[in-house]
Amino acid sequence: MTKKVVTITLNPALDLTGSVNQLNVGSVSLVGQSSLHAAGKGVNVAKVLSELGAQVTVTGFLGRDNQELFCQLFEQLGVQDAFIRIAGATRINVKLVEQSGAVSDINFPGIQVTEADIEAFEATLQRLAQDHDYFVLAGSLPQGISPQRCAGWIAQLRSMNKKVLFDSSRDALLAGLDAKPWLIKPNDEELSQWCGRELTTLTDCQQAAAELAQKQIENIVISMGAEGVMWLHENQWLHAKPPKMQVVSTVGAGDTLVAGLCWGHMQRMEKESLLRFATALSALAVTQVGVGLGDREQLNTLQQQIQVSALYPTMGA
């Protein structure tokens, strides 16, 4: 077992989150509660892992001009800060959460990364690889980093026998898949984009995941919202279905799932227990505003309500 893990956030963001009754596109929407906090997929994963008890080192690229909220968060969590500071300001992303639970994301492109910044990051990655086995690479890419370069880092870590959990989308996901990360966690929408067809049922998702398995990725985890989580490992399929949850916000639920999967593997949980734990953690996340562990007692109760079942391979799987 290990408690040490590195989370990599290449394109972090300050999330400006606001709650609205209903988003009026092309008109005025009045925001009720609002918050501005340090985020980015890898940062969110780090927060949950830290609260679970992991010894987390965070790295990636941070703009010098507005790093204060990140520094405060890292200090509060007690994580090791190995972010590369670069010129400019980290982007601000806007998330509007409607009363129905629907979330509209307005994501900006991110800061410009130079070749010198990249060299500093690569040196940090090499150093961290000396005494860490688990790496979570999550989120989008900033300007200046190509999907192929990102995939090269995955391949490099893999060649050193490191376990890379990779959670991204679009071109970064496509390139990263070819580097054979140890675990990937696309949601059903990202899986649909990858295979180029609509996925409306559990069987559809299972068939697409089976096609993805041909890329020889050891762990393929598909998050499907209220339908739960599907995991393909060593030709075995498991499906975890949570009870119906009162959705407050889906922001960070996928990142929480990644953190749960990572922690479960680090703690060498048995497969069904691991999937039950990670699914419960993610299901609990949608009942709260903000990313974090929430109520431990509620988590334990929810784990007992998660149904985990084996799935049979689909035709062609």
From Swiss-Prot:
Entry keyword Cell inner membrane: no
InterPro entries, alphabetized: 1-PFruKinase (IPR022463), Carboh/pur_kinase_PfkB_CS (IPR002173), PfkB_dom (IPR011611), Ribokinase-like (IPR029056), Tagatose/fructose_Pkinase (IPR017583)
Residues forming coiled coils: none
Chain positions recorded as ATP binding sites: S223, M224, G225, A226, E227, G228, G254, D255
GO CC annotations, alphabetized: cytosol
CDD domains: FruK_PfkB_like (cd01164)
GO molecular function, one term: phosphofructokinase activity
Consequence of gene loss (knockout): Does not affect growth on glucose. Mutant shows a severe growth defect on fructose.
Entry keyword set: ATP-binding, Kinase, Nucleotide-binding, Transferase
Expression triggers: Part of the fruBKA (fru) operon, which is induced in the presence of fructose via the FruR (Cra) regulatory protein. Transcription is repressed by FruR in the absence of fructose. CRP activates expression of the fru operon in the absence of glucose. The two regulators can work independently to control the expression of the operon depending on carbon source availability.
Superkingdom, natural source: Bacteria
PROSITE patterns cross-referenced by the UniProt entry: PFKB_KINASES_1
Family the entry assigns: Belongs to the carbohydrate kinase PfkB family.
Record-given protein name: 1-phosphofructokinase
Organism from which the protein derives: Vibrio cholerae serotype O1 (strain ATCC 39315 / El Tor Inaba N16961)
Lineage: Bacteria, Pseudomonadati, Pseudomonadota, Gammaproteobacteria, Vibrionales
